[in-house]
Curated annotation (Swiss-Prot):
It is found in: Cell inner membrane. Belongs to the UbiA prenyltransferase family. One of its GO terms (molecular function) is 4-hydroxybenzoate polyprenyltransferase activity. The chain crosses the membrane at residues 19-39, 42-62, 92-112, 115-135, 137-157, 161-181, 206-226, 233-253, 264-284. InterPro entries: HB_polyprenyltransferase-like (IPR006370), Prenyltransferase (IPR039653), UbiA_prenyltransferase (IPR000537), UbiA_prenylTrfase_CS (IPR030470), UbiA_sf (IPR044878). Its cofactor is Mg(2+). This is 4-hydroxybenzoate octaprenyltransferase. The keyword Magnesium applies. The gene is ubiA. It comes from Polaromonas sp. (strain JS666 / ATCC BAA-500). Keywords: Cell inner membrane, Cell membrane, Magnesium, Membrane, Transferase, Transmembrane, Transmembrane helix, Ubiquinone biosynthesis. Pathway: Cofactor biosynthesis; ubiquinone biosynthesis. One of its GO terms (cellular component) is plasma membrane. NCBIfam families: ubiA_proteo. One of its GO terms (biological process) is ubiquinone biosynthetic process.
């Protein structure tokens, strides 16, 4: 019984699908390296890595509770633990609260600026699941939530959030719109039936173009914002490789096949890793 319940809790937080928290982790670590002008130290690396995993897991709990009445009508999500009734709403909320408190405990080991910004991050995280009911581009709200590790990373290192952090957040928001639109393309038919709002529905026949434009803006903003990074040739090479991956994703989603769109979404963490690797190697080579 205990083992079964643990398995359901792990399924609730998508433990077997690390792509979700990796999408959060790479831009956060990139910001840590930029703010620190290199390796940020083991303390901050540990805090932000574990904090990212914990908050993404907490977000899954909140999201599944908020979407439980919608998810039962979507083939891909109908068997999620909360939707199927295997985990109660109360259990999911308690688990989410515990995970969020653990993440906050990590934040408390940093500084006052990071602690203050963590409340804003929490507010956006809680708002996203409900944005899908009222906002035609809820992926933009998710983009803010998934990018908030960037200003928090700068705050942890520099005790302030400079303009550069917000520029990087804006660029990263476009990346989130790109990959979450791919994700939304998988469920578009079901979402239309139940009245869910997504960028894939809003963009309509311009969905693929919207995805590719979002990739272009993301990579362009990050390339220009960090143009003066040490050993910039390494970073520019990484941006080029990330661009090739984006083009491949465009090829995958061109026919709007569900499996191919989902594959493109799942592979996005490699694009984020490529950008992070370029940043880390540039500072290492300096």
């Amino acid at each position: 019984m205990l083992r079964r319940k643990l398995g359901l809790y792990l399924a609730l937080i998508r433990w077997n699908r690390p792509a979700g928290w990796l999408l959060l982790l790479w831009p956060t670590l990139s910001a840590l390296w930029v703010a620190s002008h290199g390796f940020p130290g083991w303390h901050l690396l540990t805090v932000f890595t574990l904090g990212t995993i914990l908050m993404r897991s907490a977000g899954c709990c909140v999201n599944d509770v908020a979407d439980r009445d919608f998810d039962r009508h979507v083939k891909r999500t109908a068997q999620r633990p909360v939707t199927s009734g295997q985990v109660s709403v109360r259990e999911a909320l308690v688990l989410g609260a515990v995970l969020a408190l653990l993440a906050f405990g990590l934040v408390l080991t940093t500084n006052a600026a990071t602690i203050a910004w963590s409340f804003a991050a929490l507010a956006v995280t809680l708002a996203y699941p409900f944005a899908k009911r009222y906002v035609s581009m809820p992926q933009a709200v998710l983009g803010v939530a998934f990018s908030f590790g960037i200003p928090m990373a700068f705050a942890a290192v520099q005790s302030r959030v400079p303009l550069l952090a917000w520029v990087l957040l804006l660029g990263n928001l476009c990346w989130v719109i790109a990959y979450d639109t791919e994700y939304a393309m998988v469920d578009r038919d079901d979402d239309l039936k139940i009245g869910m709002k997504t960028s894939a529905i809003t963009l309509g026949r311009f969905d693929v173009a919207g995805v590719m434009l979002s990739y272009l803006v993301y990579l362009s903003v990050w390339a220009l914002a960090l143009a003066d990074i040490p050993q910039a040739a390494i970073y520019w090479m990484a941006i080029g490789l990330a661009g090739l991956q984006a083009l491949w994703h465009g090829w995958l989603i061109r026919k709007r096949e569900r499996d191919d769109c989902f594959k493109a979404f799942r592979l996005n963490h490699w694009l984020g890793f490529t950008v992070f690797a370029g940043i880390a190697l540039s500072y290492l080579a300096a």
